[in-house]
């Protein structure tokens, strides 16, 4: 490195020699060049270069197309695309073979794992109405069961008390008498549902918040509002149960909304239990 400092860049162009290229016996080339650094000092750079030829095997037709004579604005240009006249598209890799079956299988397995994780982290859901409580504590358990069992209960007479106590006959625990000879209280049957309405023909997009805030907002407050959902998919089954604060509010909602349209469907409102 030279210690002299060049004061003028114009003088530097005259003093910097041209690069020297020397061919070595081993086939490499030694290139000696000079340049100026940030301090204006002349720096000597020595590079040893080895030329390597890489042969690429392509289809004969592809090699033939590369040797075609170019025309128009590309006339007399070297082989290959010119970025001044050619816009390069996205590179697409085409993989041929049977490995795509294995890839699809791996994707399906990953989806199954995600579903399993989702089920494991899912919140508590009632198997009867789909609400966020235990099935044994479902407030509408007797109502939902009665919808499907009313016909069978009407055709099947209740067994007599004497038959219950007949020796050798099994009596369910909930039908056995206690130590004082009294039958157990039927809490669900005796529960007061005088302020509960069943709303059917609901659109599948309707949830509990839409019931409270949109459809029944002016009839609130509510003790509970539950949209009955499918046990497996979690989708709405098209009806819900809403318990109002007073019987008058429930009757007002029944008279105002029964037969009205809501999200492209005609609502049907009725009392959750037949009134005497």
From Swiss-Prot:
GO cellular-component term (any): eukaryotic 43S preinitiation complex
Keywords: Cytoplasm, Initiation factor, Phosphoprotein, Protein biosynthesis, RNA-binding
CDD domains named among the record's database cross-references: eIF3G, RRM_eIF3G_like
Residue intervals of the RRM domain: 195-274
Modified residues (Phosphoserine): 148
Record-annotated disulphide pairs: none
Subcellular location: Cytoplasm
Single GO BP term: formation of cytoplasmic translation initiation complex
Gene Ontology MF terms: RNA binding; translation initiation factor activity
Major localization listed first in the record, in broad terms: cytoplasm
General function of this protein: RNA-binding component of the eukaryotic translation initiation factor 3 (eIF-3) complex, which is involved in protein synthesis of a specialized repertoire of mRNAs and, together with other initiation factors, stimulates binding of mRNA and methionyl-tRNAi to the 40S ribosome. The eIF-3 complex specifically targets and initiates translation of a subset of mRNAs involved in cell proliferation. This subunit can bind 18S rRNA.
Family of this protein: Belongs to the eIF-3 subunit G family.
Subunit-structure text: Component of the eukaryotic translation initiation factor 3 (eIF-3) complex.
Protein name (database record): Eukaryotic translation initiation factor 3 subunit G
Organism: Debaryomyces hansenii (strain ATCC 36239 / CBS 767 / BCRC 21394 / JCM 1990 / NBRC 0083 / IGC 2968) (Yeast)
Lineage: Eukaryota, Fungi, Dikarya, Ascomycota, Saccharomycotina
Recorded name of the encoding gene: TIF35
